[in-house]
A protein has these predicted regions:
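STAS-like cytosolic regulatory interaction modules
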Residues: 1-53, 60-96
Length: 96
């Protein structure tokens, strides 16, 4: 018997992200993961600014998702964001 594919949920992050936004962002995404029990979360990052705070936010979301048995996968990431993730050593942590 083949294992079924994990349930997928999607969400988007937009705008510049301030450090003060990180706790609320994590709370909202964790609530979504708890409601859906998804195994994969597709995060549309096409509307974000590629900077260190954004990478910090994405890394925190991945950690929170893993605590819920989920994996965040990036969607519509810019080359600039992918390059920054690679530079910071997090490219494998946040797959697309």
């Amino acid at each position: 018997m083949a294992a079924s594919a994990p349930q997928t949920v999607g969400f988007a992050i937009s705008g510049p992200i301030a450090r003060a936004d990180l706790p609320g962002l994590c709370v909202r995404v964790c609530a979504l993961l708890e409601r859906t029990a998804a195994g994969v979360a597709l995060c549309d990052v096409s509307g974000i600014v590629s900077d260190a705070v954004t990478v910090d936010a994405l890394a925190r979301l991945q950690l929170a998702a893993r605590r819920h048995g989920c994996q965040v996968r990036l969607r519509r990431a810019s080359n600039e964001l992918l390059d920054l993730l690679a530079f910071m050593g997090l490219r494998d942590v946040l797959p697309d």
